[in-house]
């Protein structure tokens, strides 16, 4: 279990992000919460500056950080600042909260590849910032779409969205 790694991503409402990412090969567990804001112990009703985020625990023997990021860029629009679908505000920004320098490098390389690919019509505005405290969201937000499959989401897989292989990719 100690070989597992963490990733923290934000890309709009955390319900849809969690519902899709938790099903990916190599993902061991997920939890939704808040990070990147000004207050301690944020809540759904009080999380100024925090992004709705997902903390992913994954097995690097089964997947890698680059694969998680490529899926992340496939399921949300990284070219809209502080917005996903009908959700508007900094809570819904696109962000990668890296836990070490290697994750930062992979994040920046992946963003460069997404921009170069032309798969999205605009330039990627995803923030890349060091991970701070991750505050777990209230229980009613955990695995929300698993419990309420008819609930709101603005995330969906785009099966034809595939980045070209990078010659020097090391994830």
Swiss-Prot record:
Keywords: Oxidoreductase
Superkingdom, taxonomy of origin: Bacteria
EC numbers: 1.8.4.11
InterPro entries from the UniProt entry: Met_Sox_Rdtase_MsrA_dom, Met_Sox_Rdtase_MsrA_sf
Reaction(s) catalysed (UniProt annotation): L-methionyl-[protein] + [thioredoxin]-disulfide + H2O = L-methionyl-(S)-S-oxide-[protein] + [thioredoxin]-dithiol; [thioredoxin]-disulfide + L-methionine + H2O = L-methionine (S)-S-oxide + [thioredoxin]-dithiol
BP terms from Gene Ontology: protein modification process
A Gene Ontology molecular function term of the record: L-methionine:thioredoxin-disulfide S-oxidoreductase activity
Pfam families for the chain: PMSR
Active site: 13
Enzyme class: oxidoreductase
Similarity field: Belongs to the MsrA Met sulfoxide reductase family.
Role summary: Has an important function as a repair enzyme for proteins that have been inactivated by oxidation. Catalyzes the reversible oxidation-reduction of methionine sulfoxide in proteins to methionine.
Protein name per its UniProtKB record: Peptide methionine sulfoxide reductase MsrA
């Amino acid at each position: 279990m100690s070989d597992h790694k963490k990733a923290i991503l934000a890309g709009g409402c955390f319900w849809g992000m969690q519902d899709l990412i938790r099903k990916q090969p190599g993902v061991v567990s997920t939890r939704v919460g808040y990070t990147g804001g000004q207050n301690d112990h944020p809540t759904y009703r009080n999380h100024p500056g925090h992004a709705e985020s997902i903390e992913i625990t994954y097995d690097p023997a089964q997947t890698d950080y680059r694969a998680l990021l490529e899926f992340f860029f496939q399921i949300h629009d990284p070219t809209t600042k502080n917005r996903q679908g009908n959700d508007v505000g900094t809570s819904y920004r696109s962000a990668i909260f890296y836990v070490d320098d290697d994750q930062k490098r992979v994040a920046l390389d992946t963003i460069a590849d997404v921009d170069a690919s032309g798969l999205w019509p605009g330039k990627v505005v995803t923030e890349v910032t060091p991970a701070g405290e991750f505050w777990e969201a209230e229980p009613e937000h955990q695995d929300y779409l698993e419990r309420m499959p008819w609930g709101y989401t603005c995330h969906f897989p785009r099966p034809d969205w595939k980045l070209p292989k990078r010659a020097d990719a090391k994830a």
